[in-house]
Each structure stands twice: as C-alpha cells, then as structure tokens.
Swiss-Prot record:
Enzyme class: hydrolase
Classification via Gene3D superfamilies: 2.20.28.10, Nucleic acid-binding proteins, P-loop containing nucleotide triphosphate hydrolases
Entry GO CC: chromosome; MCM complex; MCM8-MCM9 complex; nucleus
Family: Belongs to the MCM family.
Subunit structure and binding partners: Component of the MCM8-MCM9 complex, which forms a hexamer composed of MCM8 and MCM9. Interacts with the DNA mismatch repair (MMR) complex composed at least of MSH2, MSH3, MSH6, PMS1 and MLH1. Interacts with RAD51; the interaction recruits RAD51 to DNA damage sites. Interacts with the MRN complex composed of MRE11, RAD50 and NBN/NBS1. Interacts with CDC6 and ORC2. Interacts with HROB; the interaction recruits the MCM8-MCM9 complex to DNA damage sites.
Species in which this protein is naturally found: Bos taurus (Bovine)
Name the UniProt record assigns to this protein: DNA helicase MCM8
Positions of the MCM domain: 378-585
Matches recorded under SUPFAM superfamilies: Nucleic acid-binding proteins (SSF50249), P-loop containing nucleoside triphosphate hydrolases (SSF52540)
GO MF: ATP binding; ATP hydrolysis activity; helicase activity; single-stranded DNA binding
Catalytic activities: ATP + H2O = ADP + phosphate + H(+)
Record's keyword annotation contains Repeat: no
Protein's GO biological process: DNA damage response; DNA replication; double-strand break repair via homologous recombination; female gamete generation; male gamete generation
Binding-site positions, ATP: 430-437
Lineage, highest ranks first: Eukaryota, Metazoa, Chordata, Craniata, Vertebrata
C-alpha cells in the first residue's frame, strides 16, 4: 500500500476513514455521518421523509408566485416587496393593450418581441408608473429588459390559457385541473432607441449602460453554440447541479449542493438536459463618417458586437445597421436588437414593425426636397452643383449625376429570374490635370453611401472580400472590401489604369452585382450592388487618338464593355475656352461666387448679336442647355442637401419607360446594330440597350418622376453619342466605326487583318513562322500599310496574341 496507492490517497485517506472512522481527507465527515446515522439517503445525504416534504413546500411556493415564468428571468426568490414588481405591472398593461397587434405565433417561434422605444416613453401608463423609464433602461438595462420579457411572457400565458379554456368550453370537455401552457423565454428587443452614441464617445463610463450605435458591418464570424448553463456531477455523492456561466465563461462549482457532502471534484455533463446553450455570433462594426464627424489622419473606429438567439445571421458584411445593446468590458457590446437599414428584409425587420430604410428624413428635409424638385431647370442645377470648381465638361458631369441616381433594379426579389442591375458604371479617361480626380471625389462625397479608393494602393482582397482568422477562436471570418462596403451606393476608383491584375476582381461585381468567394472551405456570395465610377490616365501620360481606349489603358475588352459610359477628356487648345477657364480659376481662387467676369459677358453678348436668326434653333442640344449662360447666376445646392435629395429619390422613386421613350431607345439601338453589321466592327449587344434603359430611368428619377418621357430618352441618346464620339474617332478626327463602341480591341483593324493574312501565307510557303523586325517592315511596305508608328502597330499585334516576341527584334507568328 506504500508505493503505488499512496499518491492517490487510497491508503491514508479513504481506506483509513472507512476502516477506523477517524477523519480521512475529504471523506471523513460523510462516511462518519453515514456510519452513525443509517437513516440518511445514501444518494442525497438527506432523510428519506424530508425529500417529498421539501418538494411539496417548493411546489407550494411556486404556486403562490403570480408570474408563471419568474425563474426564467430572475434568480431572486419572489416577494411582493421586490422594487421592480411595479415595473412588471406597468409593462404588462402596456403589452395587454397591444397584444392584438403582435403575431403571437411568431413571438413564440423566435423567442423575441420588438418594442418601439418611442411608443414606450410616450405611453401614459408607463409615464405614470415609471416616470424615468429612459434613464432606468440606460442605467439598469438587464433588469428593465427582464421586466419587459416577463411582462410579455405573462400576457402571452394568460392569452393562451384563455384560448385553451374557450376551446375546452366549446368542445364541452370537463376541466381536470388547470390547463398547462408552456411559453418559452422571450427577449424584449428595443428599437428606435435614442440618442445614437458615436463610437468615439464610448468610454469606460458607458460600461453596463444601454446605448445605440450606427455603423457598417465589416466582419461577421461563424455561428457557434454558447453555453449559458452547465450541468455538473459530483464525484463523491453523484448529485447533479446546474451552474450558470455568465458570458459563456467556463467555471467549476465551488461546493456540492448537498449539505452533508464535502466533495470538491465535479464532472461536466455536456449532454445533460440541464445544460443550456444558445446561438452566438460576433460582428465588427465600423463607424460611419459623415461630414461633421470626419477627423483628419484617423482611421475609422471599430467595435465588436455579440449577437445571440434570433439576432444571429441578421446581417452580412457591408450592411449599414443600428445596434442597441449593453456595453461590456471585453471591448464588445452585447446586442439587444439589430436594425438592418437596407432594402432587404432581415431578422430584425421581418415582423413588419420596422422595415429598414436607407436614410431618415425630417420635415425640414422634405420641404427642402420639394423646393429642389420645383426648380425649373433641375438637371442643369444638379449638374452645376456636382463639382462647381471644375469648369466645363457638362456632359461628363451629367453622366456622373445619372450614375448617382441610378436606374431601377429588376427582379431583385424574384427567385425564379436572374436580377437585372440598375446601377450604371462610368469611366472617365483623359489627360492629366483636367479634374478627373476632383470630379470623382465630389461624386463620392455627394453620394448617400460612397467609398473612394485609389487603384495603385488597392489589392484584390481590399476591393472584394477578405477571409481573416479570428484570433480568439481560430475560425475564419469574412471582412468586407470596398465594393461590398459600397453596396447600394457608389464606389469611386481613381488611378484605374494602375491597378494591375485587380481588374479581374471587378468583372463579376460589375455585371452580376455580387462577389462570390471560395476560400478555406468557405463558399459564399455577398451583395455588391454598387455603381463603379472610375478615372484613368492613358499610358504615356497623353491620350493617343490613333489608338483605341483599350490600347491607351492596357485594359481588356471584357472590363471596358461593362461600362455604360466611357468619356474621353482631351486637352485641346481653344482660345475662347482657355480664356473662360482661366477667369473661372482666378475667380474661384479669389473666393468669388460668380466665375465669369463682366468683360467676358460683354464679349460673348457681342458675339451673340452677330448670329443670324436662321442659325438659332429652338430645341437646343443638351450640351447647350446645361451650360451656364453668360450673365446667369446659379446658386449650387449644398452637398449635404443634395445627398438627402439623392437618397430620397433612390429610396422612393422607381420610374418606368413610356412608350415614346422606349421607341426612341429601340430606334437608336437598331441603328447601332445596323452600322456594326455593315462595317464589320465589334458587335453591339443587348448590354448597350440595357445601358440606355438604365440611364433613361436615372434621368426620370433625377426629377422624382415615375415615368421616363420622350425628352429623357433624347437626352440619354445625346450623352451616349457624345461618349461614343470619343471612342470611335481616330487621330484625324474621322469616325472609325470598325472600332468597338467602348474602345476595346485594336486600332487599324483592317490593316492588321491584311498584315496577319500575308504573314500566314508566307509562313505556309516557307515553313518558317519566325520573322525579323526588318522583314515585318518590308512586308508592310509591300502591302502599302500606312501606320503612324510601326513599332506600336507590332506591339498591339503582340498584345492581341497574333505575334509572340521570341527575342530582340524577333517575332513568332501564332495564327498558323
């Protein structure tokens, strides 16, 4: 007994106490008591006759508690003198008045009820019984929410018992005792809570307080079970007890509940009915940066939030949410409710009590929106309010304004159809110094939801979705990129030509409006319903009109064809335009509102007086109508108000095409098809027709109209023609329809075809597909192929895959 069993406490502890009855370690009391008192129950350590009496006493106490689910919400023993009994009675009367407004089956299924905070603080009964309800909810949220939960639990129990009694009375059944009604634990979810707390103000003094936050979801973890109560088995006497685990933190019991047992060793029973688990999820919220909250040089703050029970899976990365909950010390907030402010229905808004909205509008905002809509020439006002610092480029600004308003998405909720995107994409290409970046920043600033990124500092995962590993649990979680964060808004990408291989990540997001991810065993799809507005500089610093847009940007045709509008900005010298531009810049720098001087007005008026009356056209083109007439003053709409106007139109206006507008768009599309077939250029597809429809709907939405008219379609056709004029024209100013509509493909297409055909014949005849550079020059000279730069011509054939460079001045033909 000395060696093997001494360390296990057998020889000196348990064996000794059993044999002689003198105190072994940890077992002496119980064994001695059993030895001298054989009437004790060996399993529980209690008298056999005491057990049913104590159970009877306990059931009698439970019978006297007027609230059926008291133990589900409070650990205290019920007493009439408990101070929060009055609160429960007040909430009970509040819910009793509104019980018919709630879906009782839905409340039981989800285990939660939505409570409007504004209704709560304006209720007369609540004000009379709990005058400082707002302060009590803020300072003691757990007790107040538990009182609400118990009140609705009591109301539902009484209602179900009444229905059961009525049903029994109708069927003529005799009532043998009371009807047993089992209502689950119900959580009170408060929404519309005020005031909203900014993330920068969440400090230590908010610990344990009830607050409301608003932000963007940037990371969502997997759903896990969180243990709130664990059953433990005493190794000494076999007694089972249930221990509460606050916040899911594992803890062992300190003693056995049996008074006579002194056992200190316990085993966790994970499969016991007494073990209670709940769904748990962690999300990361990033603050929304509005104009009055921007802080230079500071990255946006984030906070971790925990979602439990029915709030799990109520949002995805990129959603804008309002979260109310209790601040905890572990740098996280336990959410009490999640209001997902998106167009789609979520867990928090399925009941119909609150449907998420993109923006909220006060009465003052609505009056301002009505005043803007009543303007006579609204399109001109909005175009000139977009970026007043940049002079001219009215049609480019018009295209950007239409992208801000966007068209209507079709079949978004129909699972049997593929949705058709309503967000137009715009690309602005041009020489440096023409204000592309300023226009892009202005658009992102005006948009209700805008994300601005720069192409040369952006990665593929930064644009789309990142799969990161959670440091605490080791699980993978999704972190949203720029396109997902710009969902139902604008994503502005500057330096678009310097993105490298990141272009491929945009293809799915631009057409399917979603981002699919398959990494580390996780396969999912996130919404990215955003308009992409990009600005790019051409290769070499200057736009070469002898090349196509694709050759100027080194960009594939698959990406270019997804842009609805491609604008080419060229820095061409023009005396009148340069004079106006210089005066505009000087006036802006001087801080004047009027950018055109009186001398310019006099000069322009003298020019207008010499114009023949025969040259005056009553129906001015759109480019003329959008220009500010000399002598005319325009008061631009402030960006803060314009943002509200755009948000209102995107939220409430869904225009449709009239018959005349559809006919104009169809005629223009058919004419494009006819030209593409006749001149063997790149095909015009239905993608161009959908672009025309989207932009026409945006033109009607800009004026808050439900129907797009004939004039809207004519304006869009003019903007589209202006866009195509830049992509089709060559270095001589002629329209080369052999180029594709969006400038993809090659310049000198017919010359390239003849050249490659001649190389094929020579290679077949000589059985050699390698050519020296001087040989290629000689062949081009014999074919009389006139190109401005022969090296660029061969380089474009190399880019298109016709020729492969095998060494210095040596090329291999790839089309044999």
């Amino acid at each position: 007994m000395n060696g093997k069993y001494r360390g296990r406490g057998f020889g000196q502890g348990r064996f000794q106490s059993w044999k002689s009855g003198r105190g072994g370690r940890g077992f002496s009391g119980k064994w001695r008591e059993r030895e001298h008192r054989p009437d004790l129950n060996k399993a529980t350590g209690k008298h056999p006759e005491q057990t049913p009496q104590s159970l009877l006493l306990q059931s009698t106490l439970d019978h006297f508690i007027p609230y059926k689910g008291w133990k589900l919400y409070f650990s205290e023993v019920y007493s009439d003198s408990i101070p929060f009994i009055e609160k429960i009675e007040a909430f009970e009367s509040f819910f009793t008045e509104r019980i018919e407004l709630y879906d009782k089956d839905e409340i039981e299924r989800k285990g939660s009820i939505l409570v409007d905070f504004k209704e709560l603080i304006n209720d007369d009964e609540i004000i009379k019984l709990i005058p400082n309800i707002a302060n009590e909810l803020r300072d003691t949220p757990e007790k107040t929410l538990a009182c609400m939960g118990l009140a609705i639990h009591q109301v539902l129990t009484k209602d179900l018992e009444r229905h059961a009694a009525e049903l029994q009375a109708q069927e003529g059944l005799s009532r043998n005792g009371e009807t047993v009604v089992n209502v689950p634990h119900i959580h009170a979810r408060v929404y519309n809570y005020e005031p909203l707390t900014q993330l920068k103000n969440v400090r230590a003094n908010y610990y344990g307080k009830y607050i409301a936050l608003r932000g963007t979801v940037v990371r969502v973890s997997n759903t896990k079970p969180l243990c709130t109560k664990m059953a433990f088995l005493c190794a000494a006497c076999g007694e089972i007890q249930s221990l509460s685990l606050p916040d899911g933190k594992y803890n062992l019991p300190t003693k056995c509940p049996v008074p006579a047992c002194r056992g200190k060793s316990f085993t966790a029973l994970r499969s016991s009915p007494l073990t209670v688990t709940m769904d748990w999820q962690s999300i990361k919220i990033q603050e929304l940066m509005s104009d009055d909250q921007r802080e230079a040089g500071r990255i946006p703050r984030t906070i971790e939030c925990e979602l439990v029970h029915d709030l799990v899976d109520s949002c995805v990365p990129g959603d804008t949410v309002t979260i109310t909950g209790v601040v905890k010390v572990s740098n996280a907030e336990e959410a009490n409710s999640v209001s997902n402010n998106k167009g789609q229905k979520t867990k928090a808004s399925e009941d119909g009590c609150k449907h998420g909205a993109l923006m909220e509008f006060s009465l003052k905002d609505l009056y301002a929106i009505q005043e803007i809509q009543s303007e006579e020439n609204l399109f001109k006002l909005i175009v000139n309010s977009l970026c007043p610092v940049i002079f001219g480029h009215e049609l480019v600004k018009a295209g950007l304004a239409l992208a801000l308003f966007g068209g209507s998405q079709k079949y978004a909720d129909d699972k049997n159809r593929i949705p058709i995107r309503g967000d137009p994409h715009v690309l602005v290409v041009g020489d440096p110094g023409l204000g592309k970046s300023q226009m892009l920043q202005a658009v992102c600033s005006v948009a209700p939801r805008g994300v601005y990124v720069c192409g040369n500092t952006t990665t593929t995962s930064g644009l789309t979705v990142t799969l990161s590993k959670d440091s605490s649990s080791g699980d993978f979680a999704l972190e949203a990129g720029a396109l997902v964060l710009g969902d139902q808004g604008i994503c502005g990408i500057d330096e678009f030509d310097k993105m490298g291989n990141q272009h491929q990540a945009l293809l799915e997001a631009m057409e399917q409006q979603s981002i699919s991810l398959a990494k580390a065993g996780m396969v999912c799809s996130l919404p990215a319903r955003t308009s992409i507005i990009a600005a790019a500089n051409p290769v070499g610093g200057h736009y070469n009109k002898a090349k196509t847009v694709s050759e100027n940007l080194k960009m594939g045709s698959a990406l270019l064809s997804r842009f609805d509008l491609v604008f080419i900005l060229l820095d061409t010298p023009n005396e009148d335009h340069d004079h106006l531009l210089s005066e505009h810049v000087i006036a802006i720098r001087a801080g004047k509102q009027r950018a055109v001087s009186s001398a310019t007005v006099a000069r322009m008026n003298s020019q207008d007086s010499n114009t023949s009356i025969l040259e005056v056209v009553s129906d001015k083109p759109l480019s003329e109508r959008l220009k500010v007439v000399p002598g005319e003053t325009i008061d631009p709409i402030p960006h803060q108000l314009l943002r509200k106007y755009i948000g209102y139109s995107r939220q409430y206006v869904y225009p449709r095409l009239s018959t005349e507008a559809a006919q104009i768009l169809q005629n223009f599309y058919l004419e494009l098809r006819k030209q593409s077939q006749r001149l063997s250029s790149s095909p015009i597809t239905t993608r161009q027709l959908e672009s025309l429809i989207r932009l026409t709907e945006a033109r009607a939405r800009l004026e808050l109209r439900e129907e797009a008219t004939k004039e809207d379609a004519e304006d869009i056709v003019e903007i589209m023609k202006y866009s195509m004029l830049g992509t089709y024209s060559d270095e001589f100013g002629n329209l080369d329809f052999e180029r594709s509509q969006h400038g993809s493909g090659m310049s000198n297409r017919s010359a390239a075809k003849r050249f490659i055909s001649a190389l094929n014949k020579i290679a077949e005849r000589t059985y050699n597909n390698l050519f020296q550079f001087h040989q290629l020059q000689q062949i081009a000279k014999e074919l009389n192929i006139q190109v401005a730069d022969f090296e660029n011509f061969i380089g474009s054939l190399n880019d298109q895959g016709y020729l492969l460079k095998k060494g210095p001045k040596v090329y291999q033909l790839q089309t044999m």
